[in-house]
C-alpha cells in the first residue's frame, strides 16, 4: 500500500505500526486520538518518510510510509 502513496495523498495512520516506534517514543509515547481518527495529507516525501498534516491546528509530523495507509 505504501508504494501508492504520494504527495497530496489522503492517509490514515496505522495504530499497530505506530505502537513502540521510534517516531512515537520521540514524543510522549501516547498516540493522539486525531492521528488515528482523522485523515492526514502528505505534504512531502523524503526517502521512507512522509510529512503529514492532520486536520487539527498542530505541527506537521514525519511518519514512515509503512505507518500510513490510503484514506480512500
Swiss-Prot record:
Keyword line: Membrane, NAD, NADP, Plastoquinone, Quinone, Thylakoid, Translocase, Transport
Compartment(s) of residence: Cellular thylakoid membrane
Top-rank lineage group of the source organism: Bacteria
GO cellular component assignments: plasma membrane-derived thylakoid membrane
Major subcellular location class: membrane
One Gene Ontology term of the molecular function aspect: quinone binding
Disulfide partners: none
Topology in the lipid bilayer: Peripheral membrane protein
Top EC group: translocase
Entry EC no(s): 7.1.1.-
Cross-referenced InterPro entries: NdhO (IPR020905)
Recorded family membership: Belongs to the complex I NdhO subunit family.
Function comment: NDH-1 shuttles electrons from an unknown electron donor, via FMN and iron-sulfur (Fe-S) centers, to quinones in the respiratory and/or the photosynthetic chain. The immediate electron acceptor for the enzyme in this species is believed to be plastoquinone. Couples the redox reaction to proton translocation, and thus conserves the redox energy in a proton gradient. Cyanobacterial NDH-1 also plays a role in inorganic carbon-concentration.
Oligomeric form and interacting partners: NDH-1 can be composed of about 15 different subunits; different subcomplexes with different compositions have been identified which probably have different functions.
Protein name: NAD(P)H-quinone oxidoreductase subunit O
Gene name tied to this protein: ndhO
